[in-house]
């Protein structure tokens, strides 16, 4: 809470910012009765920080329905018609944490609000105010407050219900026209999603409830659990009738569709070379993609919020904890053509030394994107060389592209509230001795404005793959593979990042200019006084940061893939199959854009303080979700109707850059001060029995499986649910029973 007074000495808190905590915890400045007190500051101590995943559902409850139909019909000896139809429906339900106010969107509490502890000394009609706390010299008329980052725990967790319906139809003809094979068809698919979230909070209705002058007003000062665990639940909730006055449901509807028509033709014997028949394939394709995203009226700007206490404070969203998002839709038409040729240059019958077989593949594809008026053409070349039987080498070179998606092109502007460090303000505080360093800069809510553009061009890429395959004749059934790959991506579509934009604003202000993408209010007299003598021009608070989608920088990644596949010859003890795969990420380097290079140069030259770090650039190997090693392997044994399988999966260690040592180490390793996230190894075990006889049970299989056999937890990380969900699984030991019958 923030008391709207100019003199901090009017209360025992001696600060305009305070938060509530149990009186049994140290740091109390002012008694708030009923076992709670006020402590100065705006960042709660560790003991009272709320467990934001309390009561949440980690894994959604899901119900799925599927239906499919296939039909083939021979029109003639050479032509067949086909049809495929499918329908899919899913119903998901989960609980999310209770709603909270965004850090950049505080709510004003009137001095006349019934539960305001710093309200007037008397209520309407001259009745003494029972809720005004003693021991202050706040004027008898009371003081307004601002409520920041408040979580409505007494409203309960949010229920999220997501229903998805998808269907797909395919129809076409295939066959041959003379020596040519052809396939032509039409595909249409559509998916619609309804997302309903209950137990949300309307800012407008909330403020009306808080600022009532009667006891049925919402009371945000009653504390959570003063005698129990203050980090979860609410032991002193407001009455349900009060909460119901501002409780709302929020909905979102979205959908995508794809219409595609194509014609493909191929022939595997266009003409003959000494190495064999030359094959060719080609085709043309048209596709139309659409999407729509229909947000709730309280999110899309139809119903907005204007603070009735704090002048000039508005928000495009009336939903607590959610930034405004406009309704968005888009359409894209794409025309494409491709051609491919297979050229066998050498075969074994030619008896060429050290060349048992040599094959070449050449391909190309061209696409035109109508909505962004961009045309791309990409080639591909691949070769396979068998040195001697059982020893082969392979390689491929290709160019690729990825068009910006429809959201990146059609987004008219989405705002997001993020907690960011205002390095400019904090640098002035460091210069004045108010902060020890920029590392102590307290985060504040910052509005980031993200928008799309039709001027975005497709991303380009270049890939190289080189590999070898070994199938030694003296070990029948064994195959070993090793492949090196390298991918270079150019003009990646993304955002610069509001935190990087603020850091760039500091760098330029140190040189006498500014970053125009960081829009600030005019400095107040207090801010002008703060900047005096610091060498920086006075700066006001950040209004918003412009962070549009751009074609930014390049990325180069490379690594190795290894494989082992072994079907053990039958030696009388059943059939064994072994499989092992390993992926070694060698490097993942993200280059900087022009603005990024300016930041990196400023850090290297010492113009930016060492406390300013630039994320997402440079060598990102083992950073966040990019482990060096991923491995998986399995052993299967089969004898008659019985099969037993053992599967293992390994995911390597990574660094969590959101956790930094309190005392920094001096090290040549740039990641030494980050938190090291452990690796994980999971084991699955399965048993199956298949009935093979002449009865009605023939073809029936009963399978029993245990996933995560040893009930391993994911390694700890500073993430939403305490682990990297894109790398590790939180599912404990899971038992599966499956009964399948083939007809």
Residue ranges and their predicted role:
Residues 87-91, 177-179, 186-194, 269, ...:
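Transmembrane beta-strands of outer-membrane beta-barrel pores
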Residues 69-73, 171-175, 261-267, 337-343, ...:
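Residues on the lipid-exposed face of transmembrane beta-strands in outer-membrane beta-barrel proteins
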Residues 76-79, 176-182, 270-278, 346-358, ...:
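Short loop/turn motifs that connect adjacent beta-strands in outer-membrane beta-barrel proteins
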Residues 416, 574, 578, 582-695:
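C-terminal beta-barrel architecture of Gram-negative outer-membrane proteins
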Residues 81-83, 182-184, 278-282, 337, ...:
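Transmembrane beta-strands of outer-membrane beta-barrel proteins
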Residues 4, 9-12, 16-62, 68, ...:
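Surface-exposed, low-complexity loop segments enriched in small/polar and acidic residues
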Residues 204, 479, 488-491, 586-587, ...:
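C-terminal beta-signal and adjacent terminal beta-strands/loops
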């Amino acid at each position: 809470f923030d008391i709207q007074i100019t003199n901090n000495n009017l209360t025992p808190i001696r600060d305009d910012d305070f938060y509530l905590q149990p009186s049994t915890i140290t740091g109390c400045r002012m008694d708030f009765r009923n076992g709670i007190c006020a402590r100065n500051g705006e960042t709660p101590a560790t003991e009272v920080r709320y467990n934001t995943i309390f009561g949440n559902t980690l894994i959604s409850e899901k119900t799925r329905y599927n239906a499919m139909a296939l039909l083939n019909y021979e029109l003639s000896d050479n032509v067949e018609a086909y049809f495929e139809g499918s329908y899919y429906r899913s119903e998901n339900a989960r609980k999310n944490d209770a709603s909270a106010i965004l850090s950049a969107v505080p709510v004003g509490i009137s001095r006349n609000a019934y539960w305001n502890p710093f309200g007037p000394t008397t209520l309407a009609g001259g009745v003494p105010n029972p809720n005004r706390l003693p021991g202050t010299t706040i004027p008898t008329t009371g003081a307004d407050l601002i409520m920041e980052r408040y979580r409505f725990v007494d409203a309960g967790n949010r229920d999220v219900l997501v229903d998805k319906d998808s269907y797909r139809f395919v129809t076409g003809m295939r066959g041959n026209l003379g020596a040519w094979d052809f396939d032509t068809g039409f595909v249409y698919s559509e998916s619609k999603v309804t997302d309903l979230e209950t137990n949300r909070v309307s800012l407008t209705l909330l403020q009306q409830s808080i600022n009532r002058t009667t006891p049925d007003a919402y009371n945000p000062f009653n504390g959570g659990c003063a005698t129990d665990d203050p980090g979860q639940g609410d032991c002193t909730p407001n009455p349900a009738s009060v909460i119901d006055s501002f409780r709302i449901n929020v909905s979102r509807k979205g959908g995508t569709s794809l219409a595609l028509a194509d014609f493909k033709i191929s022939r595997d014997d266009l003409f003959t070379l000494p190495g064999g028949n030359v094959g060719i394939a080609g085709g043309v394709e048209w596709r139309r993609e659409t999407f729509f995203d229909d947000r709730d009226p309280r999110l899309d700007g139809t119903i907005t919020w204007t603070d009735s206490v704090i002048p000039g404070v508005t928000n495009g969203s009336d939903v607590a904890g959610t930034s405004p998002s406009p309704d968005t839709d888009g359409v894209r038409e794409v025309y494409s053509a491709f051609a491919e040729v297979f050229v066998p240059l050498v075969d074994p019958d030619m008896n060429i030394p050290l060349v048992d077989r040599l094959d070449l593949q050449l391909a190309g594809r061209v696409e035109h994107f109508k909505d962004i008026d961009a045309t791309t053409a990409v080639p591909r070349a691949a070769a396979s060389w068998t040195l001697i039987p059982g020893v082969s080498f392979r390689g491929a070179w290709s160019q690729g592209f990825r068009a910006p998606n429809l959201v990146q092109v059609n987004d008219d502007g989405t705002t997001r509230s993020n907690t960011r460090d205002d390095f400019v303000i904090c640098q002035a505080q460091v210069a004045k001795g108010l902060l020890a360093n920029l590392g102590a800069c307290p985060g504040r809510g910052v509005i980031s404005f993200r928008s799309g553009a039709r001027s975005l061009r497709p991303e380009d890429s270049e890939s190289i793959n080189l590999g070898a395959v070994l199938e030694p004749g003296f070990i029948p059934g064994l195959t070993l593979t090793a492949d090196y790959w390298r991918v270079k991506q150019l003009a990646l579509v993304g955002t610069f990042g509001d935190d990087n934009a603020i850091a760039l604003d500091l760098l330029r202000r140190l040189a006498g200019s500014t970053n125009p993408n960081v829009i600030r209010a005019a400095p107040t007299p207090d801010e002008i006084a703060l900047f005096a003598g610091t060498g920086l021009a006075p700066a006001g608070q950040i209004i918003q940061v412009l962070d549009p989608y751009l074609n930014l920088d390049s990325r180069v990644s490379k690594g190795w893939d290894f494989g082992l596949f072994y079907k053990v010859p039958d030696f009388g003890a059943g059939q064994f199959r072994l499989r092992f795969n390993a992926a070694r990420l060698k490097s993942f380097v993200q280059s900087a854009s022009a603005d990024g290079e300016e930041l990196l140069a400023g850090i290297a030259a010492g113009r930016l303080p060492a406390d300013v770090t630039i994320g997402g650039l440079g060598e990102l190997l083992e950073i966040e979700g990019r482990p060096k090693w991923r491995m998986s392997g399995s052993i299967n044994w089969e004898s008659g109707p019985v099969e037993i399988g053992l599967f293992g999966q390994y995911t390597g260690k990574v660094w969590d850059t959101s956790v930094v040592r309190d005392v920094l180490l001096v090290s040549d390793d740039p990641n030494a001060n980050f938190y090291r996230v452990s690796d994980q190894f999971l084991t699955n075990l399965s048993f199956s029995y298949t009935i093979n006889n002449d009865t009605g049970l023939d073809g029936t299989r009963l399978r029993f499986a245990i996933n995560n056999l040893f009930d391993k937890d994911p390694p700890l990380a500073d993430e939403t649910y305490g682990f990297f969900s894109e790398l590790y699984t939180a599912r404990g030991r899971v038992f599966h029973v499956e009964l399948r019958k083939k007809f």
